[in-house]
């Protein structure tokens, strides 16, 4: 049964494994700008059941969103790259709190996000030896962490609609280029006729990615 769970300073919605009692892997999904944890938690039944023993956690971003009274943000969108760089400290804190909470190795955790959550995934995630990173309609705002790429740096799935009028699809091409240049293993799904949203096709791609990269 889903529950509100605080991990470190982050409060979010947690779904324990449905197919097992012991947590052997974890999917963390970060919501977009002006949304909250509930926005991503709807994906738990779809993505969280791919692997036996897999739990699902959707944290709320730490800051209230001025443009959305009930929403949250990872950083002020007016700050662009600088905002993403400053917010990486929050993601570091989140990941380290998760490691402590579940006693899981990074290699059993997938980090993903939608829109601004996808931006944060690509900003902070590459420095960790995670099982994988998934960005839905995101962008690579900063290359600060990419120099830390190693042989065991995580595989990355980029999913984007070609009709996205919020984060243009060119962001996918740009991210792919920079990530591959630094040696990352990147899989790209550019969906025709899809705007700024997560489609069934995108979810199928994410499920396959999770199945391939979580043991």
Functional labels for PLM-detected ranges:
Residues 3-104:
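Serine-hydrolase catalytic machinery in alpha/beta-hydrolase-like enzymes
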Residues 31-33, 109-114, 161:
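Conserved alpha/beta-hydrolase "nucleophile elbow" surrounding the catalytic nucleophile
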Residues 59-60, 112, 134-137, 159, ...:
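Alpha/beta-hydrolase-fold catalytic nucleophile elbow
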Residues 99, 107-152:
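Primarily recognizes the serine-hydrolase "nucleophile elbow" in alpha/beta-hydrolase
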Residues 151-156, 182-184:
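Short, proline-enriched alpha-helix->beta-strand connector loops that line the catalytic pocket
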Residues 157-160, 164:
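Short beta-strand/loop motif that positions the catalytic acidic residue
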Residues 165-171:
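Conserved alpha/beta-hydrolase "acid-adjacent" motif
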Residues 173-215:
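C-terminal catalytic histidine-bearing segment of alpha/beta-hydrolase fold enzymes
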